[in-house]
């Protein structure tokens, strides 16, 4: 997977990624979503496999970014059921330490690769998606 990219050219990934911008301003655009600017952080960006996208922080503010990549039948079912949709890749959730702590736990879990680490990571992804959906639509 090639994670580095040119903002002008964008990129395609072969996995989903859930990005949390905890603080800062920036822009996002994808094949299914028009260019959108946002301020103040507290945003999830969900990237879809095989879909062109580009995003960047504002040069004036920068941003704090956390991300996790994933694939599998569970997420494919959620997308197939329209629970998650490439036309709605942004989730305005605000700033939450709990979300940041889940990303930090995912990083430690991936680095340590202890018994059951993939199941733990899958659980963390489901929790993060649950936060996105719950906070946005309640």
Which role does the model predict for each range below?
Residues 78-138:
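Amphipathic alpha-helical segments enriched in hydrophobic/aromatic residues interleaved with Lys/Arg
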Residues 1-86:
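N-terminal regulatory/effector-sensing and dimerization cores
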């Amino acid at each position: 997977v090639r994670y580095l990219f040119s903002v002008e050219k964008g990129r395609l990934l072969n996995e989903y990624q859930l990005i949390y911008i905890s603080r800062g301003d920036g822009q996002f655009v994808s094949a299914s979503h028009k260019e959108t600017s946002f301020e103040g952080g507290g945003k999830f960006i969900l990237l879809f496999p095989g879909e062109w996208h580009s995003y960047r922080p504002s040069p004036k503010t920068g941003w704090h970014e956390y991300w996790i990549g994933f694939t599998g039948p569970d997420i494919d079912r959620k997308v197939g059921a329209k629970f998650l949709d490439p036309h709605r890749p942004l989730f305005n959730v605000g700033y939450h330490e709990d979300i940041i702590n889940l990303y930090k736990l995912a990083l430690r879990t991936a680095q340590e690769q202890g018994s059951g680490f993939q199941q733990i990571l899958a659980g963390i992804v489901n929790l993060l998606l649950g936060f996105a959906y719950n906070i946005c639509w309640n």
